[in-house]
């Protein structure tokens, strides 16, 4: 198939109608660049939402790589979850041979930047933040691995029932800090920042109007971030939980032993990668380090790594090493990890914090509405006072005209919204009384 015709069968409804989706977006600035293209910050003009657009050049891709692009579009469009980067739309330019993916904008960067920040500050990431991020990633993987939503916790002592697996399950296959994005709470304005005014928006607006030191904390405050799992370009969708993938993909530092040994693998490979990510959050370096790929491969196959620093609890250390387990029979699944009491405690804490923040948001919203209503009441009182004064002046003027013997003119049809009929009776009263 000719490269320019590759995406013809995948045309979106807008393209079929002759209106490409990219015409609805305004590009603000480039925020990243990779081997296949760039990442740009854009505004969806009709809704004025701040989004991200991935510009992917497919002209030099082989058939396998182009199929991965289609797979990413398909997977992202199906995965709707608060801890997964939301996919909005896609489009392509046949002349430039570029595919455009429109996705949620995560304003706090990614987990690798967070780890780098703490490493530069020579500080450990607080354990509460580590548990919170682990709990959020597990809820995202639960959606991927079972194809269903994770039930909300009522209490931390709730016992989960084994999930009824959905039709399709997804293995991410490239779980690493750079693919884990950070944002604010859903009630914040990370993708809903509104732009007042015109369709054309100055890109400096978003440099000057970021949510930073307000109720969400400083730019480097990670205590209230929401984790978003993204970059599903290497993900594989399996029709049933019995199927195993065999393709060799992923990032070496976070790659599971079964992938390295070219063996069939399952969602448990994502658990291994997640364990490596959480280990790096605690130790500020990957669990397996080597001077060359062969040495790294040997270390991963053996599965031997150091414990996390003593700054962290034994419980956290234990759950990390349970995920970095070479034995697939003893490596826990997403469901089993979510049964852990500390994970449940972290989940419940996140639920309560989110509920509290929403209450504060509603309180602030009500306060703002109250201020607006008070301002409007003052304005209405002022206007009413002016109307009363004008009414009194009009009546007195007509009374003076009658007393002086002048002919009373026609009452004006309206004075600032008061119609002539309302003035007609008082004017007639004065006219007959003093005749």
Curated annotation (Swiss-Prot):
<dbReference type="InterPro" id="IPR017441">
    <property type="entry name" value="Protein_kinase_ATP_BS"/>
</dbReference>
<dbReference type="InterPro" id="IPR050660">
    <property type="entry name" value="NEK_Ser/Thr_kinase"/>
</dbReference>
<feature type="region of interest" description="Disordered">
    <location>
        <begin position="1"/>
        <end position="22"/>
    </location>
</feature>
<dbReference type="GO" id="GO:0005634">
    <property type="term" value="C:nucleus"/>
</dbReference>
<dbReference type="GO" id="GO:0106310">
    <property type="term" value="F:protein serine kinase activity"/>
</dbReference>
<keyword id="KW-0808">Transferase</keyword>
<dbReference type="InterPro" id="IPR008271">
    <property type="entry name" value="Ser/Thr_kinase_AS"/>
</dbReference>
<keyword id="KW-0723">Serine/threonine-protein kinase</keyword>
<dbReference type="GO" id="GO:0004672">
    <property type="term" value="F:protein kinase activity"/>
</dbReference>
<feature type="binding site">
    <location>
        <begin position="31"/>
        <end position="39"/>
    </location>
    <ligand>
        <name>ATP</name>
    </ligand>
</feature>
<dbReference type="Pfam" id="PF00069">
    <property type="entry name" value="Pkinase"/>
</dbReference>
<feature type="active site" description="Proton acceptor">
    <location>
        <position position="174"/>
    </location>
</feature>
<dbReference type="GO" id="GO:0005524">
    <property type="term" value="F:ATP binding"/>
</dbReference>
<dbReference type="InterPro" id="IPR011009">
    <property type="entry name" value="Kinase-like_dom_sf"/>
</dbReference>
<feature type="domain" description="Protein kinase">
    <location>
        <begin position="25"/>
        <end position="343"/>
    </location>
</feature>
<dbReference type="GO" id="GO:0005737">
    <property type="term" value="C:cytoplasm"/>
</dbReference>
<dbReference type="GO" id="GO:0044732">
    <property type="term" value="C:mitotic spindle pole body"/>
</dbReference>
<keyword id="KW-0547">Nucleotide-binding</keyword>
<dbReference type="InterPro" id="IPR000719">
    <property type="entry name" value="Prot_kinase_dom"/>
</dbReference>
<protein>
    <recommendedName>
        <fullName>Serine/threonine-protein kinase KIN3</fullName>
        <ecNumber>2.7.11.1</ecNumber>
    </recommendedName>
</protein>
<comment type="function">
    <text>This protein is probably a serine/threonine protein kinase.</text>
</comment>
<dbReference type="GO" id="GO:0007059">
    <property type="term" value="P:chromosome segregation"/>
</dbReference>
<keyword id="KW-0418">Kinase</keyword>
<keyword id="KW-0067">ATP-binding</keyword>
<comment type="similarity">
    <text>Belongs to the protein kinase superfamily. Ser/Thr protein kinase family.</text>
</comment>
<dbReference type="GO" id="GO:0004674">
    <property type="term" value="F:protein serine/threonine kinase activity"/>
</dbReference>
<feature type="binding site">
    <location>
        <position position="54"/>
    </location>
    <ligand>
        <name>ATP</name>
    </ligand>
</feature>
């Amino acid at each position: 198939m000719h490269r320019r015709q590759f995406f013809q069968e995948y045309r979106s409804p807008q393209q079929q109608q002759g209106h490409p989706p990219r015409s609805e977006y305004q590009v603000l600035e480039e925020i990243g660049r990779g081997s296949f293209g760039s990442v740009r910050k854009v505004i969806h003009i009709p809704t004025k939402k701040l989004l991200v657009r991935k510009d992917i050049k497919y002209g030099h891709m082989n058939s396998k790589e182009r199929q991965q692009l289609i797979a990413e579009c398909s997977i992202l469009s199906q995965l709707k979850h608060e801890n997964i980067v939301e996919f909005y739309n896609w489009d392509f330019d046949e002349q430039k041979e570029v595919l455009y993916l429109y996705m949620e904008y995560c304003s706090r960067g990614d987990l690798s930047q967070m780890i780098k920040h703490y490493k530069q500050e020579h500080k450990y990431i607080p354990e509460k933040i580590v548990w919170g991020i682990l709990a959020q990633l597990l809820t995202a993987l639960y959606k991927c691995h079972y194809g269903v939503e994770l039930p909300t916790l009522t209490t931390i002592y709730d016992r989960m029932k084994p999930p009824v697996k959905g039709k399709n399950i997804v293995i991410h296959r490239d779980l690493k800090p750079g693919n884990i994005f950070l944002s604010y709470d859903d009630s914040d304005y990370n993708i809903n920042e509104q732009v007042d005014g015109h369709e054309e928006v100055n890109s400096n607006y978003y440099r000057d109007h970021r949510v930073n030191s307000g109720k969400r904390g400083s730019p480097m405050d990670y205590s209230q971030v929401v984790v978003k799992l993204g970059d599903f370009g290497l993900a594989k969708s399996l029709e049933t939980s019995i199927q195993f993938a065999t393709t060799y993909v992923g990032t070496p530092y976070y790659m599971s032993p079964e992938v390295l040994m070219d063996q069939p693998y399952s969602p448990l490979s994502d658990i291994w990668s997640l364990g490596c990510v959480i280990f790096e959050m605690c130790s500020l370096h990957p669990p397996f380090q080597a001077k060359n790929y062969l040495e790294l491969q040997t270390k991963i196959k053996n599965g031997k790594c150091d414990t996390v620093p003593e700054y962290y609890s034994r419980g956290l250390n234990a759950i990390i090493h349970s995920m970095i387990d070479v034995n697939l029979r003893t490596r826990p699944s997403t469901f089993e990890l979510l049964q852990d009491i500390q994970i449940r405690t972290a989940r419940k804490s996140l639920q309560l914090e989110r509920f509290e923040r929403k209450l504060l948001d509603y309180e602030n919203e009500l306060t703002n509405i109250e201020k607006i209503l008070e301002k409007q009441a003052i304005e209405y009182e002022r206007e009413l006072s002016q109307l009363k004064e004008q009414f009194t002046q009009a009546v007195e003027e007509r009374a003076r005209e009658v007393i002086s013997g002048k002919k009373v003119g026609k009452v004006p049809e309206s004075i600032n919204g008061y119609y002539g009929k309302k003035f007609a009776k008082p004017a007639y009263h004065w006219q007959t009384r003093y005749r």
